[in-house]
Amino acid sequence: EEGNPLGVQGTQFRFAAAPPTGEDDVKKTEWQTQQVYMAHSAVTTTDNHYADEKWSRAQASLAGVDRSPFRVYLDDWQWTSSTNDLFPATLNANSEQFGYSLKLTSSAPYQKQGEQGYSTKSADGQVASYYYSQPFIDVSGEVTIDGETHQVSGEGWIDREWSSQFLL
C-alpha cells in the first residue's frame, strides 16, 4: 500500500518415506502413511526476513492435496482454489511473527521447463523430473508483520516439479 518492496514465499514439499513394497505397505488406517509434507513460509522486507516451517505426515486433518476443488494444505497453511485448476486461488499462512492472505489469479499459459516439461538433472539422463512454471500471477491481499497488517499487490510465480526419485 505504501510502495515498499516486499517478498512473500510459500513452498510445500511432499516426500514418500519409502516406496510401497507390497501388501504390508497398504494403509490400514489413515494414520499409516508413507507420505510426509513439509512447508516453508516467509516474508521479507527491506530490513527484515521472517520465516517458519511446518512438518506433518499426510492425514486428512493435517496435510494433503485435494483434487476437487484443488487444495494443497499443511495445517492452516493452504493454497485453495474454487475449481480443479490452480487459479483463481488463495494462499494463506500464519505464523507467530507474520502471516498472509493473498488472492492469486492468472490466465497466462504455463511455461514448460526442459524438453516439453521433462527436465534432465544429470549428465547421463538418469535423473530427471517433470517441471512447469507459471511466472505471470497477479497477487493482492494482506500481509501481517508483528501485528501490523498491510494491503499488498504485485506479481508472483509458481513452480511445480515432481519426480520418482529424490532430487538433490
Walk through the language-model features, giving the residues of each.
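Targeting-peptide/extracellular-domain and disordered-appendage signature
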Residues: E1-L168
